Amino acid sequence: MKIKVVDMTYEQALAQPPQVHKKPKKPSLLFRTILRAASAPDLLATHFHCEKIGMAQIKSDEPCLVLMNHSCFLDLKIAEAVLYPRPFNIVCTSDGFVGKEWLMRSVGCIPTRKFCSDTTLVRDMLYCVRTLKTSVLLYPEASYSFDGTATPLPESIGKCVKALNVPVVMIRTYGEFARDPL
């Protein structure tokens, strides 16, 4: 991917206007369907299967908070396979938006900064569940693990769950790191 680089002094960089916040978009059904179709070969190759426990208690049009462990690059494909056709927005680092913001927003990504308090993210998540009526996919570990094991969750995740006031769904994956390590 090519990134445009502009040479400027430190003072010129500071004089740049601040980035304007954009509200999240409801994920496009077209992009969700393409992602599901593109995911199929990898999931078939891994003999992917899942067990849904208690999902019948959540209505198909009811937004929820989806918490998923993050152990390899197949995570998004697995989430799409498990949750399809339920629309969901994905919490994603802002550096993933460089050069492809329109695509990331069309898929339903919400930009955030890692490892710091981000009140804008909480407001965006509230906007998704209350206004857009979409679920939110969150990887609370905030990074891939290097050995496929789970890392401790931050204590602030409880505050987030309480603020959203929606059902919580947990997707726990096993063995995918062995298939597609980092």
Predicted regions span which residues?
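Helix-to-loop junction immediately C-terminal to a conserved catalytic motif
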Residues: R32, A38-H70
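Catalytic core of membrane glycerolipid acyltransferases/transacylases, capturing the structured
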Residues: S60-S117
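Residue-level preference for the first positions of well-ordered beta-strands
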Residues: P63-L65, K133-Y139, V169
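Hydrophobic/aromatic ligand-binding patch that stacks against planar heteroaromatic rings
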Residues: V82, L103, C128, K159-A163
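Helix-adjacent hinge/juxtasegments
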Residues: I110-K133
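A cross-family acyltransferase "interaction/gating" segment
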Residues: G148-L182
